[in-house]
Each structure stands twice: as structure tokens, then as C-alpha cells.
């Protein structure tokens, strides 16, 4: 399966798992936004510390604007393979196409590590 047009770089499975773990921890001890509307608003307001986008979203247009918006606002973003797993990490019973970490809480160190690895991946992709 080819990757969606909005996916700008590949994320290794171990990093994707760390991202989901960071979302879980931030949900419990910090603050997150769930879903594309809330995520978009958090990015536009400059509140997001990390944006997480699922790569299995249909239609792609639902999240296609997020990578560009994040780059414009200088907010790091990363991909996870499953909207269902992202929804579960957010504490939802349903899938989530995207989410944003606003306050990482106890996930601060994990978030810093993720952002560093994402910058390295983006450097390789360009």
C-alpha cells in the first residue's frame, strides 16, 4: 500500500509506539486535544507541543492540511499507523484521525525525545 499524500516522512514502529505512549501519559497528567477540529484550532493558536496524525485516514483531506499548518506554525508533527490506536490512546471509544499534546505533563521527557527523533527523520526525508 502506498503512503497517503499527506505523509511527508516514514515513522519507525518503535517511535510510533512511543508517540502513543506520550499521548496516553499527557492525557492522564497533562492536556491533549482530540480530533482534527480541536487539533487544528490548537495549532492555529500555537498551543500544540506535538501534533499526532494517523496515516489510515479516509478521505485524506480530513487531515491533509495539518502537516503544512504545523510547518507554518513551527509545531512538530508525527504520524502513527492507526486512527483506532490513536483514539484509544486519547481515551476514546472511537478512532481519532489526529490529536495534539498541549501540556505533556509526565510525558515531557518522552515528548522531547520524540521531537528530536522527528527532526532527524524530517532531515533525512528532505
From Swiss-Prot:
One of its GO terms (molecular function) is rRNA binding. It is found in: Cytoplasm. Pfam families: Ribosomal_L7Ae. GO terms for biological process: ribosome biogenesis; translation; tRNA 5'-leader removal. One of its GO terms (cellular component) is cytoplasm. InterPro entries: eL8/uL1-like (IPR050257), Ribosomal_eL30-like_sf (IPR029064), Ribosomal_eL8-like_CS (IPR004037), Ribosomal_eL8/eL30/eS12/Gad45 (IPR004038), Ribosomal_eL8/Nhp2 (IPR018492), Ribosomal_eL8_arc (IPR022481). Its main location: cytoplasm. Keywords: Cytoplasm, Ribonucleoprotein, Ribosomal protein, RNA-binding, rRNA-binding, tRNA processing. Multifunctional RNA-binding protein that recognizes the K-turn motif in ribosomal RNA, the RNA component of RNase P, box H/ACA, box C/D and box C'/D' sRNAs. Belongs to the eukaryotic ribosomal protein eL8 family. NCBIfam families: eL8_ribo. Part of the 50S ribosomal subunit. Probably part of the RNase P complex. This is Large ribosomal subunit protein eL8. It comes from Sulfurisphaera tokodaii (strain DSM 16993 / JCM 10545 / NBRC 100140 / 7) (Sulfolobus tokodaii). The gene is rpl7ae.
Amino acid at each position: 500500500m502506498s503512503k497517503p499524500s499527506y505523509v511527508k516522512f516514514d515513522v519507525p514502529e518503535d517511535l510510533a509506539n512511543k508517540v502513543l505512549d506520550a499521548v496516553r501519559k499527557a492525557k492522564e497528567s497533562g492536556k491533549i486535544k482530540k480530533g482534527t477540529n480541536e487539533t487544528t484550532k490548537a495549532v492555529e493558536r500555537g498551543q500544540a507541543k506535538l501534533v499526532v496524525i494517523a496515516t489510515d485516514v479516509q478521505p485524506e483531506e480530513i487531515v491533509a492540511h495539518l502537516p503544512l499548518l504545523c510547518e507554518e506554525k513551527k509545531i512538530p508533527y508525527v504520524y502513527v499507523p492507526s486512527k483506532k490506536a490513536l483514539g484509544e490512546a486519547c481515551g476514546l471509544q472511537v478512532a481519532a484521525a489526529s490529536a495534539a499534546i498541549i501540556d505533556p505533563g509526565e510525558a515531557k521527557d518522552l515528548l522531547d525525545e520524540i521531537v528530536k527523533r522527528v527532526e532527524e527523520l524530517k532531515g533525512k526525508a528532505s
